[in-house]
Amino acid sequence: MAQKERGERDERDGEFVDRLVHINRVAKVVKGGRRFGFAALVVVGDQKGRVGFGHGKAREVPEAVRKATEAAKRGMIYVPLRSGRTLHHDLEGRHGAGRVLLRSASAGTGIIAGGPMRAIFETLGMQDVVAKSLGSSNPYNMVRATFDALKHQMHPRDIAVQRGIKYSILQARRQHLVDAEG
């Protein structure tokens, strides 16, 4: 595999949207004093259901962001969206002391989420969602907890297969519940 020259861009770069979530200045104590560096947390998505996050460390901010972006592209996941705009069902995710609750929302609700979660939903292409962060407000824990929840998102067809029932029956039950709420 040939190495890419510095400054060359991958052809797929145009289809991804990236958001810088957090930059942290870190220090390493050495004999001559402190040596400073930077750690960056970046979220990358195609706004069509694929999203990933990455962590990069370097002596300079742009290099840390570049490394984080590359890591995010390597670790992307696919999240099935209902009508291309919201979740199929409510979710809960955990990581460390961080806990997030994600709820599907009706059309026109928008993204109601704080901090790092908003960046994830925007890059994912989600338009309507309500999210609540409980516990740790550390951006790393919030991002990982959100990804934990999104990994457990299942399409209703997969749920129907697991339960051994027809998709149309599951869909009819859901519509009955929606009509009862309305």
Curated annotation (Swiss-Prot):
Molecular functions (GO terms): rRNA binding; structural constituent of ribosome
Residue ranges of domain S5 DRBM in the record: 16-79
Top-level lineage group: Bacteria
Record InterPro entries: Ribosomal_Su5_D2-typ_SF (IPR020568), Ribosomal_uS5 (IPR000851), Ribosomal_uS5_bac-type (IPR005712), Ribosomal_uS5_C (IPR005324), Ribosomal_uS5_N (IPR013810), Ribosomal_uS5_N_CS (IPR018192), Ribsml_uS5_D2-typ_fold_subgr (IPR014721)
Pfam families: Ribosomal_S5 (PF00333), Ribosomal_S5_C (PF03719)
SUPFAM superfamilies: dsRNA-binding domain-like, Ribosomal protein S5 domain 2-like
GO BP, one annotated term: translation
Record keywords, A-Z: Ribonucleoprotein, Ribosomal protein, RNA-binding, rRNA-binding
GO cellular component, one term: small ribosomal subunit
Domain remark text: The N-terminal domain interacts with the head of the 30S subunit; the C-terminal domain interacts with the body and contacts protein S4. The interaction surface between S4 and S5 is involved in control of translational fidelity.
The protein's role, per its UniProt record: With S4 and S12 plays an important role in translational accuracy. Located at the back of the 30S subunit body where it stabilizes the conformation of the head with respect to the body.
PANTHER family linked: MITOCHONDRIAL RIBOSOMAL PROTEIN S5
Family listed: Belongs to the universal ribosomal protein uS5 family.
Subunit annotation: Part of the 30S ribosomal subunit. Contacts proteins S4 and S8.
UniProt-recorded name of the protein: Small ribosomal subunit protein uS5
Gene: rpsE
